[in-house]
């Protein structure tokens, strides 16, 4: 405040008061300045103490967390140990087989040789339980869990299904017949007579079909991928079998119009190694392709390769049962119009003339079984029986009569023309040929291969001194010289080519001579002939000759005319025996 003339007013206070007030203010300012000066140092100390406190807190917190984690782990370990103790202290659980469900939601089970009615835990869904299913029982014999079906047991043979459809008659060991229940997996499934089933003999349930390897191996083999074009030297025989097999399937309306029934069977007979089995396999393959071409759908046929010795069984009736099973499966597959070929290899070993057995008369029941299958009460539609044998004279005549094996085709040993055809299947222009042999034909691979084949066939089929093999003496005293060409076969030709290829490989490795030569083939012929020197070594020349395809007058004596493999061993004679009627 000021006066009117501009002089400051003192507010009625004296100068001493004002001076005192000024001093107080100055002291306050000084104190503030001092405190301001000291303030940064104090703040720093507080910050340090605060940081120390925070570090201590963090350490205590971490220690507390570790302690809490240790306590939790200890608690979990204690709980696990307690559970283990409780588990080990529990009484053992039992197992049973579910039989039926009752109206009060209890169930009947079979356990420990007893049939019991027990209660079920709420955790088990009654609607999912199936007949024959395994269940778990607690100490109070209450069901606490549902398990799978039994997987082990006794193998029995199915005979027939009973009228109620829930039970079956089976044959156990020692031909014991039993009535058993069908478990749920078998209900509604197709079960055929002769099928093997898995039986739980305690509960009386059969659970599943068990494939029997000795039967399954013989049944339903897919068609081999062998075409007629792969077979050489048998054009006439192939034409015969195509007429007998393919025409009825490709033109059934013509057969029906002419009231002609297709043949039921074909017999392929002839010496070993001449292509009987090969033709049978090609029949199935060709038939499938022809059916596919006619219908426009994927062609399929089945080739059941039945090896005679595999069917034989020491137990009475087992061989006949296997034959029935084979034809039963064949009928099932053929019922849909699919052609099925049942091929009996080495037919003479299984269906020998009845009464010709020396140690047993097993053929007395096996032969009638086959006859009843071929033309019995059940029709054999779309099923063709093909038999192969090199001793057709030993097959029972009832099998060979018309109406059973209608078509009989002889697979002869190849002549020179057929041998050239067979060689052409194995000697092709894709093989590596020696440069010297190629140069003789101006580099023409086709001409070179043709020349090799001609030279090899000429070496095999000429009636020269070095090609003489045997001198046979007949029962009437006549003698005849047989050459190697009389014992040639497609298998021998293949073996000769394989020998020549091996020689070519060895020449390349030893002498760096690359490619097949005609000299390899000629040397392979010599080695093959020498190796066959020991083949007629038998105590029964007549039977050996029949197997080899030499029919006619009975042979009583054989003498080899070739030298040994080293070229120094003289020819030798082979004695005969008095009884020449027994088959070796």
UniProtKB/Swiss-Prot annotation:
Subunit structure: Homohexamer. Assembles into a hexameric ring structure that caps the 20S proteasome core. Strongly interacts with the prokaryotic ubiquitin-like protein Pup through a hydrophobic interface; the interacting region of ARC lies in its N-terminal coiled-coil domain. There is one Pup binding site per ARC hexamer ring. Upon ATP-binding, the C-terminus of ARC interacts with the alpha-rings of the proteasome core, possibly by binding to the intersubunit pockets.
GO terms of biological process kind: modification-dependent protein catabolic process; proteasomal protein catabolic process
Stated family: Belongs to the AAA ATPase family.
Family matches, as SMART domains: AAA (SM00382)
The organism of origin for this protein: Nocardioides sp. (strain ATCC BAA-499 / JS614)
Record's comment describing the protein's domains: Consists of three main regions, an N-terminal coiled-coil domain that binds to protein Pup and functions as a docking station, an interdomain involved in ARC hexamerization, and a C-terminal ATPase domain of the AAA type.
PROSITE patterns registered for this protein in UniProt: AAA
Chain residue ranges for the region called Docks into pockets in the proteasome alpha-ring: 583-584
Pathway: Protein degradation; proteasomal Pup-dependent pathway
Segments forming a coiled coil: 16-91
Pfam families noted in UniProt: AAA, Prot_ATP_ID_OB_C, Prot_ATP_ID_OB_N
One GO MF term: ATP binding
Entry-linked InterPro entries: AAA+_ATPase (IPR003593), AAA_ATPase_domain (IPR050168), ATPase_AAA_core (IPR003959), ATPase_AAA_CS (IPR003960), NA-bd_OB-fold (IPR012340), P-loop_NTPase (IPR027417), Prot_ATP_ID_OB_2nd (IPR032501), Prot_ATP_ID_OB_N (IPR041626)
Residues holding ATP: 273-278
Job of this protein: ATPase which is responsible for recognizing, binding, unfolding and translocation of pupylated proteins into the bacterial 20S proteasome core particle. May be essential for opening the gate of the 20S proteasome via an interaction with its C-terminus, thereby allowing substrate entry and access to the site of proteolysis. Thus, the C-termini of the proteasomal ATPase may function like a 'key in a lock' to induce gate opening and therefore regulate proteolysis.
A GO-annotated cellular component: proteasome complex
Annotated keywords: ATP-binding, Chaperone, Coiled coil, Nucleotide-binding, Proteasome
Record's protein name: Proteasome-associated ATPase
Disulfide feature: none
Upper classification of the organism: Bacteria, Bacillati, Actinomycetota, Actinomycetes, Propionibacteriales
